[in-house]
């Protein structure tokens, strides 16, 4: 939007360069390319994360994922997507949208970031949904409250057994032996 471009212009003018900018309602690959050009003209380098929040944007997710090398991830906007398709923001009605985002990110080596869990006080539900996101292929989950961060981090942190297994696989791979 015009307001978003103004915000970006002010950010670039004040020479404050964050590590990331999250772009809500990422419209298309062209949308990201415009932002990329503005950042480049300012002589800055920070990464972009696009949010996929509608059926139209989901339909273009592969081209959005390929828009610019500055893009490091795509985030799923579950609430807006649910509203767009007339569904509840539960896991099942949005599984296809999540799968498309995860696949597009995997194809391009991007972070796939799941939508936030909106019930701030329900840590059991947050843990369950975060583990589901992990098993679905997401590499991260957004948080809407600082109290959620430890639950999300715990779910995405590999266990000692998982680390040991990964090391064993790497050791065998270095030997040229399959497991």
Which residue stretches match the model-derived regions?
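Expand to "…catalyze enediolate/carbanion chemistry for C-C bond making/breaking, isomerization
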Residues: 1-179
